Amino acid sequence: MVEELPSVFLVGPMGAGKTTIGRLLAKQLGRTFVDSDWYVESQTGADIAWIFDKEGEAGFRERETRAIDELTQQPQIVLATGGGAVMAAENREFLKQRGIVIYLNAPVDVQMARTAKDKSRPLLQQPNPRKILQGLYSARDPLYRQVAHIIMPTGHTYPRHMVNQLLQQLNSFCASTSVVSEPEKD
C-alpha cells in the first residue's frame, strides 16, 4: 500500500523532529527527502538568519511560499516544512491538496530541549525563548491540525520507532481513503 502513497509532507513546530523523521521516512519509502528551509537557502545562496536579517520575516515567508508551491508539485517526495509554513493559507492549501500531511506535535518542553542551543533559529534569538515557543505553538497548533491528515505526538519515542508507527498509520490512512499515487504529468 505504501508504494501507492502520494508525497508526504511533515508539518509541526521547530524542534518537533521533521528533518530527522523525514530523512528516516524517506529512506524507508525509497523516496527523495527535501527540507523546505534548506531548499530556500539553496535557491537564495543565503541562510535563513541572513534572509530574516535583510528581508525580515515577510521576505522569508514569500520565498517559503514559492518553495512550497514548487516542492509540493514534485511526485513522491517526503517534505519537511518550516515551522511557520502553515501560517500562509496558500501553503496550507498546497499541502492539504497535494499530498498526505503529517503533523509532528511536540510539546513546548520538547521544543525547548531540542532548540535551546541552536543559534540558527532567528525567532528564538530573544530573551525568553520559552515564551516565544509557547506563543508560536498556541498560534500554529490549530493550523497544523487543520491541514493534517495524521497527527503524531513526538518527544517520547525513538525516531526509528516513530517512523515504524508512521508507516502503519500511512497504510491505515490509505486503506481507509481513496488515496492513490499522483497522476502522471503531461
From Swiss-Prot:
GO molecular function, one term: ATP binding
Keywords: Amino-acid biosynthesis, Aromatic amino acid biosynthesis, ATP-binding, Cytoplasm, Kinase, Magnesium, Metal-binding, Nucleotide-binding, Transferase
Gene: aroK
Alphabetized InterPro entries for the sequence: P-loop_NTPase, Shikimate/glucono_kinase, Shikimate_kinase/TSH1, Shikimate_kinase_CS
CC terms in the record's Gene Ontology section: cytosol
Cofactor(s) needed by this chain: Mg(2+)
Pfam family, one: SKI
Residues annotated as binding ATP: 15-20, 121
Binding residues annotated for Mg(2+), in chain numbering: 19
Main location: cytoplasm
SUPFAM superfamilies tied to this protein: P-loop containing nucleoside triphosphate hydrolases
Reactions catalysed according to its record: shikimate + ATP = 3-phosphoshikimate + ADP + H(+)
Assembly with partners or alone: Monomer.
Compartments, as annotated in UniProt: Cytoplasm
Similarity comment text for this entry: Belongs to the shikimate kinase family.
Role this protein plays: Catalyzes the specific phosphorylation of the 3-hydroxyl group of shikimic acid using ATP as a cosubstrate.
E.C. numbers: 2.7.1.71
Record-level GO BP terms: amino acid biosynthetic process; aromatic amino acid family biosynthetic process; chorismate biosynthetic process
Organism (species): Psychrobacter arcticus (strain DSM 17307 / VKM B-2377 / 273-4)
Associated pathway: Metabolic intermediate biosynthesis; chorismate biosynthesis; chorismate from D-erythrose 4-phosphate and phosphoenolpyruvate: step 5/7
Record's cofactor remark: Binds 1 Mg(2+) ion per subunit.
Residue sites binding substrate per the record: 37, 61, 83, 140
Enzyme class per UniProt: transferase
Name recorded for this polypeptide: Shikimate kinase
